[in-house]
């Protein structure tokens, strides 16, 4: 429990809430008449307002990307290894904004928020949101903060998709786009994994059609299974083998179906239990659908190069060798399209055994490459 924070930490941070009363039209055809976005900032906005960086989170992420909320916090924000003084996203140089997206469950308006029309939680009645919807809401937050142009928009996984969408929806408001461990659209296999996770939630008897909050219950089993399936895809076979192998929890097998016998079983159950106690099931459904629906080239006759024709940003694309959820081949597909569109793009493939989750881990070569790129950004 840190009472004196590390020298490269942003230290104590306080979340802020932005309220928007102007309706937000959504891709699904519905609109949100009003909504809140919770966010944090790190560093100082310069006089020219030219040093702002937007952090876009992945499926289970949120606004708390760096620092601590109190001196008693056991863990810092989810990307603390990359944000802070002297880190790749250097807060002595950049003013960093990190938010929880619409539909989230960490303070921004989402399924667990109260629907003003009913006085009850939105639940399953919360509209389906897309990556494009998120970017539109983020643009309104930028307007509120007086930020006309982002020095960089950065994200990993689903966050990388948002960074890419920024260069399409608001091509003149982004100078650098960093898409890390991401893809221009999901593969059929990825959509299949998301569907298995959704079915685990939807078929949990405690889901109650999404109205579980009104009944004072949560679909714990469904959320647990969804997280277990998802977590397997975030790791690599090599990393799981190195960490767990075929290690047993006890000295012998029990020859039954209920005991936790292998160490990897124990790990997955722990991950599922922990996740089911902090995440909203309806939000999980929304996030996986946003992933599935992301396919910006569909609006350009499936021509990915044409998709980025109007982009003015410089691009940095990063992938990890053992990431099979968002493989290096998907990043190279994106890079090829950007080159065909004659965009300024660099590509980094990091040799790392940790799989998809490598983008969250302080791997020295990754941090060095990330920092080198950010150091090149002029303000």
Swiss-Prot record:
* Catalysed reaction equations from the record: L-homoserine + succinyl-CoA = O-succinyl-L-homoserine + CoA
Which EC number(s) does UniProt give? 2.3.1.46
> Quick one: which pathway?
Amino-acid biosynthesis; L-methionine biosynthesis via de novo pathway; O-succinyl-L-homoserine from L-homoserine: step 1/1
UniProt keyword Amino-acid biosynthesis, yes or no: yes
Q: InterPro entries in the record, alphabetically?
A: AB_hydrolase_1, AB_hydrolase_fold, HAT_MetX-like
Q: Which UniProt keywords apply?
A: Acyltransferase, Amino-acid biosynthesis, Cytoplasm, Methionine biosynthesis, Transferase
Q: What does this protein do?
A: Transfers a succinyl group from succinyl-CoA to L-homoserine, forming succinyl-L-homoserine.
Subunit notes for this chain? Homodimer.
**Which protein are we looking at?**
Homoserine O-succinyltransferase
This protein's encoding gene? metXS
């Amino acid at each position: 429990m840190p009472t004196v924070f590390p020298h490269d930490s942003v230290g104590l941070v306080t979340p802020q809430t932005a309220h928007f009363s102007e309706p937000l039209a959504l891709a699904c055809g519905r609109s949100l008449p009003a909504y809140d976005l919770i966010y944090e900032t790190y560093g100082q906005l310069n006089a020219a307002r030219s040093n702002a960086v937007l952090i876009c989170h992945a499926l289970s992420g949120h606004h708390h990307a760096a620092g601590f909320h109190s001196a008693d916090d056991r863990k810092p924000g989810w990307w603390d290894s990359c944000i802070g003084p002297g880190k790749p996203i250097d807060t002595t140089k950049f003013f960093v904004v990190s938010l929880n997206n619409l539909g989230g469950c960490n303070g921004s308006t989402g399924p667990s928020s109260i629907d003003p029309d009913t006085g009850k939680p939105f639940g399953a009645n919360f509209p389906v949101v897309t990556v494009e919807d998120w970017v539109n809401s983020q643009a309104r937050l930028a307007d509120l903060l007086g930020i006309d142009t982002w020095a960089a928009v950065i994200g990993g996984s689903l966050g990388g998709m948002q960074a890419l969408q920024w260069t399409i929806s608001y091509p003149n408001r982004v100078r650098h786009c960093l898409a890390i461990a991401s893809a221009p659209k999901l593969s059929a296999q990825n959509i299949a994994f998301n569907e298995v996770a959704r079915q685990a939630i939807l078929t949990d008897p405690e889901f109650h059609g999404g109205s579980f909050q009104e009944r004072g219950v949560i679909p714990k089993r469904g959320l647990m299974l969804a997280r277990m399936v998802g977590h397997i895809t975030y790791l690599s076979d090599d990393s799981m083998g190195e960490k767990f192998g075929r290690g047993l929890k006890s000295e012998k097998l029990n020859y039954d179906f209920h005991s936790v016998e292998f160490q990897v079983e124990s790990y997955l159950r722990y991950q599922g239990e922990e996740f089911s106690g902090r995440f909203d099931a309806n939000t999980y459904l929304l996030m996986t659908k946003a992933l599935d629906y992301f396919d910006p080239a569909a609006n350009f006759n499936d021509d990915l190069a044409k998709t980025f024709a109007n982009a003015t940003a410089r691009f940095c694309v990063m992938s990890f060798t053992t990431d099979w959820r968002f493989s290096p081949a998907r990043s190279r597909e994106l890079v090829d399209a950007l080159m065909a569109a004659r965009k300024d793009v660099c590509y980094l493939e990091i040799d790392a055994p940790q799989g998809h989750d490598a983008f969250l881990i302080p791997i020295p070569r990754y941090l060095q490459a990330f920092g080198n790129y950010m150091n090149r950004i002029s303000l």
